[in-house]
Amino acid sequence: MRALAVVAMVATAFLAAAVHAEQCGSQAGGAVCPNCLCCSQFGWCGSTSDYCGAGCQSQCSAAGCGGGGPTPPSGSGGSGVASIVSRSLFDQMLLHRNDAACPASNFYTYDAFVAAASAFPGFAAAGGDADTNKREVAAFLAQTSHETTGGWATAPDGPYAWGYCFKEENGGAAGPDYCQQSAQWPCAAGKKYYGRGPIQLSYNFNYGPAGQAIGADLLGDPDLVASDATVSFDTAFWFWMTPQSPKPSCHAVATGQWTPSADDQAAGRVPGYGVITNIINGGLECGHGEDDRVADRIGFYKRYCDILGVSYDANLDCYSQRPFGS
C-alpha cells in the first residue's frame, strides 16, 4: 500500500460527507444487519417488504440468512468470474474507486476485470466448490484493494470501501527506477519499474515475465500497466497465478492446493489468507507481531467475504510467520 501519503488530501475532500447513519450494505462499508434482518437498498435494517423486497442488498430471506452470511446479489448470468461478481456487485465492492478524489477514477472497469480474468481460466474455478471460488475472488480483490487503497479510519462508508483508488505508486515517477541488473530482463533506457496496477507490480524482474506471459512489452513500455486497464488487471492476475520459488502462487493457497513443507511449518506458514500476505509483502509485514498493514488486508477480505456471502477461512494473519526465504 503505497498511496497513504495522499490520504490526508482525500480525507479533507470528504470530511463533510463523513457522518453517515446508514446501517448496512454499500452505504455502510458492506456491513450486514444483525439478527438476520434485511438490508434495504438505502442501507437500513428491517424485516418488512420495504427492506426485504426490491433493491434489498443482503439477507433478503430467512434461507439466505440461515447460511451464516448475506445473500449476495444475483450474478450477471455469465461464466467464470462474471458468474460470481456481477457489474453491480463489482461497483458495490469497489465502492469509491471512481470517486473524483481518487487518481485512478474511471480507470479500473468491470469489463477490464472480467476480460483479464478470462485470460487466466484457473482463477476462481475450483471445480464444484462455489465457496472456494468466492473466497479466492474476495482474497484477490482484498489484497489488491490494500495495495491501491485511498481509505482512512473515518472515511465515508468505512476504510474498506476505498480500494482501487490508485493506479500508480504515489511519487513513483520521481522515485528510484526499481531496476536490478538482469541479462534476462534488461531495463529499458529511461524507464522506471515502480508500482503500477492493482498489485502494484514493481521491478524489471516482474515487469519482464509478466509482459511475456500476457504478450505485451512491459520492459519497453511499463506505463501500459497504468494506461490500459485490461493490461493492468492482467499483470495482477499473472502475479496471483504464478509461483515464484520458494513461494507458492497466491492462487494455490487460496484454492487449498498448497501443502506446506516441513520448513514452511517450522516457519509458521500454514494454509490461509495470511500466507497470501506473506507471498506479497512478507519481508516487510510478517513475522514481527501485529502490523496495521496486515490488519488492513484482513479488513478488506472480511468485507468482501461478507458481501459474497461466504465465511472466512482460518489463519488470516501472518503475525507469527517468518517471511519466505528468511
UniProtKB/Swiss-Prot annotation:
This protein's record includes keyword Signal: yes
Catalytic activity: Random endo-hydrolysis of N-acetyl-beta-D-glucosaminide (1->4)-beta-linkages in chitin and chitodextrins
Pfam family name, one: Glyco_hydro_19
EC category name: hydrolase
Record InterPro entries: Chitin-bd_1, Chitin-binding_1_CS, Endochitinase-like_sf, Glyco_hydro_19, Glyco_hydro_19_cat, Lysozyme-like_dom_sf
EC number: 3.2.1.14
Stated role: Hydrolyzes chitin and plays a role in defense against fungal pathogens containing chitin. Its overexpression confers enhanced resistance to sheath blight pathogen (R.solani).
Family: Belongs to the glycosyl hydrolase 19 family. Chitinase class I subfamily.
Name under which the protein is recorded: Chitinase 12
Upper lineage: Eukaryota, Viridiplantae, Streptophyta, Embryophyta, Tracheophyta
